[in-house]
């Protein structure tokens, strides 16, 4: 208990010493891949001034350590947040205090602990509670829980951006072609057309 409180204090102190734009990522699957893709883009754009959580350091120990390792000169920080039970992401997001909160997907991971898909969606939506004022929530438009996620984000005053194949998505995936290097060539439609 004292160790956990010390880690939380470390996380809060580490977060308060940086002026970086912070991105938090959660979801039932795809957290690490999305975190790494965001990092690769921002690392290149910022000429090395981006930081990310190491591996899958996404719990009550890993998140504080990842925050503590973030250089003060960082322009961007990307942090993965995972959970097994309701309430865990709420604790992590208040440490991370993201400007952008991303939910990759809602799937039956940890359903044995949460009991229903609705409960999983609610637990993932906890990430919005830590959003900085004026923050942005990025949600999966293809999820049957997208309306609930959008409500949760709007309840904290977040700007909402949805993504996916759904016609209603703000950023709509039109095509994805696997490439020889292991990536994919994607075609997306943005709000401007």
What do the PLM-derived regions correspond to, one by one?
Residues 117-121, 151-193:
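Adenine nucleotide phosphate-binding catalytic loops in nucleotide-utilizing enzymes
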Residues 4-141, 147-156:
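Phosphate-binding loop of NTP-binding sites
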């Amino acid at each position: 208990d004292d160790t956990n409180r010390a880690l939380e204090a470390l996380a809060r102190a580490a977060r308060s010493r940086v002026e970086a734009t912070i991105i938090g990522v959660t979801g039932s699957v795809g957290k690490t891949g999305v975190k790494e893709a965001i990092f690769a883009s921002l690392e290149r754009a910022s000429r090395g001034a981006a930081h990310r959580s190491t591996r899958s350091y996404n719990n009550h120990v890993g998140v504080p350590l990842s925050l503590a390792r973030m250089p003060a000169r960082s322009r961007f920080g990307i942090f993965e947040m995972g959970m097994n039970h309701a309430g865990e992401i709420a604790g992590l997001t208040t440490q991370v205090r993201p400007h952008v909160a991303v939910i990759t997907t809602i799937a039956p991971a940890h359903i044995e602990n949460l009991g229903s898909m609705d409960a999983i969606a609610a637990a993932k939506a906890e990430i919005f509670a830590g959003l900085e004022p004026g923050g942005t929530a990025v949600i999966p438009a293809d999820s049957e829980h997208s309306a609930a996620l959008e409500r949760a984000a709007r309840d904290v005053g977040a700007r909402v951006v949805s993504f996916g194949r759904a016609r209603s998505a703000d950023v709509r995936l039109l095509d994805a072609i696997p490439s020889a290097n292991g990536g994919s060539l994607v075609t997306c439609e943005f709000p401007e057309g």
